[in-house]
Design a protein with these regions (language model features):
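Helix-coil boundary and interhelical linker segments in multi-pass alpha-helical membrane proteins
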Residues: 1-5, 57-70, 120-133, 189-192
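Structural signature of hydrophobic alpha-helical transmembrane segments
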Residues: 3-18, 66-82, 134-146
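Generic transmembrane alpha-helix signature in multi-pass membrane proteins
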Residues: 21-29, 88-94, 104-108, 113-126
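Interfacial loop-to-transmembrane junctions
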Residues: 155-174
Length: 192
């Protein structure tokens, strides 16, 4: 598969949040403020890229030669957990404000199904290392794109006094996410 096509399709057509519906917990939880959404998006980009590289290497150079392919889920989770710990320590030291604003969602990247999902998609599609990294880059860039758009929309909606009180917060966020998902479905005709 052409790498550019894979890159573009993983951002827009197969968007990890709005098409594959992976990583919805941080999508709803962190998208209330634009700054927090950007920070979470960057952390997820970093973790998805590194975890895709590491899980591809573990799968092809450890699990397959030892005929332990059935342990891929457990080994992928262990790799992701170690990487998230690294990101958490780095953020705590380099940007304490962002570390505090992400709160519980930072350790939850360990169980973010988007991170594990990209690694599993790379394995299931039998991508080469280059294809896996391109898919990981596109998927990981699609995550902050979606979460930043959502945060911007939610901030604007929170400032609107005409919205009924019963729709404010999560109900309107769910409707907004659905509309965003439908909008991203419009990209599906780009690739046959």
């Amino acid at each position: 598969m052409d790498l550019l096509l894979l890159f573009v399709s993983s951002i827009f057509i197969h968007n990890i949040l709005l098409s594959r519906f992976l990583g919805c917990c941080p999508f709803m939880g962190v998208s209330t403020k634009l700054e927090t959404a950007r920070g979470m998006g960057l952390a997820v980009v970093f973790v998805i890229m590194l975890s895709s590289l590491m899980t591809w290497l573990v799968y092809h150079y450890v699990l397959v030669p030892l005929h332990l392919e059935y342990l891929y889920t457990l080994s992928f989770i262990l790799v992701i957990a170690a990487l998230v710990q690294f990101v958490e320590l780095a953020l705590k030291k380099l940007n304490p404000g962002l570390y505090k604003s992400l709160g519980i969602f930072l350790p939850l990247i360990t169980t973010n199904c988007a991170v594990l999902g990209v690694a599993v998609i790379n394995m299931n599609e039998n991508y080469t290392l280059a294809q896996s990294l391109v898919n990981a880059l596109g998927s990981s860039l699609g995550f902050p794109l979606a979460i930043t758009l959502m945060a911007g929309i939610r901030e604007r909606l929170d400032q609107n006094d005409a919205i009924p009180k019963c729709l404010r917060g999560l109900p309107l966020a769910l409707v907004t996410a659905g509309l965003m998902s439908i909008a991203f479905m419009g990209f599906s005709g780009m690739v046959k």
